Amino acid sequence: MHTGGEPLRIVTDGFPKPDGKTILQKRRFVKEKLDNFRKLLMHEPRGHYDMYGALLVEPDIEDADIAVLFMDNRSYSTMCGHAVIALGRYATDYGYVRPTEPETKVNIECPCGLVKALVEYKNGKSGSVRFQSVPAFVFATDVELNVQGHGKVKVDISYGGAFYAFISADKLGLDLWKTPINQIKDAATMVTNAVKNEVQLEHPDDNDLAFIYGTIVTDGKDEYSDEPTANICVFADAQVDRSPTGSGVTARTALQYHKRHISLNKSRVFVNARIGSKFSAKPVRQTKCGSYDAVIIEVSGHAFYTGKSAFTFEEDDPLKGGFLLK
């Protein structure tokens, strides 16, 4: 499937069953013991540098209809909004839930927590999906970093199921629409590396959630407007999201709410600056995450089917483990 151009390879069979009582334990087990399967599915020659995957596992939350581990070119994310949108349709269409009109509810257990998706359903066909995030919050604003090639810059850090750094393109001397994408990718990666080196992240629920997943370069238009606001997300190992980034839009909306640029139940459109794909998002209610003031964000988008595949490897294949070209 794809959501806004960002691929999602849903793994339904053939992957060894991960040990663990909780989804974070299963994530840790797959990361430590079964990572060769991620590389086989995500990397060339079966995948590519920017491939993204979702492994369906047994839920450990009673209310969950499905549970998922996310995977990318480097490791395993704790949340992925574009994947949740796709999985909402998939669960509705493949019998994980009973379809109901006008919307079908799908509870998806993610490593960051339970995410509730609502899938449009009419005349036997699923459509667009909206989901409500886990509590999203701002970790810090105006964090000064020493960024290789750019000197001292300030970023905001916000959580939307995963942690992201936010910076406007002009602060890096970039044009979000015209600068070659590799230059944006390199600059964003340097920002992410600086956060890793200089900022100690924390999450109230679990230390496994306390890592920087990527940097989102924006157009700087955070004041509320009916006009779309653009961004590009660079995550994992310099992977470029083709969609506006579901968890990133969640974190960015939480940041805008924190700065009083947007109010509850006001919807904003977010667009990928290069692909043109769009998500909409709105803060729907206040909450807490530990001691942090948090907000639940509702994100909407549409996913589409792209095909079915069965992957194999031969033992004598010298490249059976996969590879990446940088």
UniProtKB/Swiss-Prot annotation:
The active site is at residue 80. One of its GO terms (molecular function) is hydro-lyase activity. Its EC number is 4.2.1.77. It comes from the Eukaryota. The keyword Protein transport does not apply. Substrate binds at residues 81-82, 241, 246-247. InterPro entries: Pro_racemase_fam. The keyword Lyase applies. It catalyses: trans-3-hydroxy-L-proline = 1-pyrroline-2-carboxylate + H2O. Keywords: Lyase. It holds the Pfam family Pro_racemase. Belongs to the proline racemase family. Catalyzes the dehydration of trans-3-hydroxy-L-proline to delta-1-pyrroline-2-carboxylate (Pyr2C). In contrast to the T.cruzi proline racemase enzyme, lacks the conserved Cys at position 245 which is replaced by a Thr residue, transforming the racemase activity into dehydratase activity. Homodimer. This is Trans-L-3-hydroxyproline dehydratase. It comes from Saccoglossus kowalevskii. The lineage of its organism: Eukaryota, Metazoa, Hemichordata, Enteropneusta, Harrimaniidae.
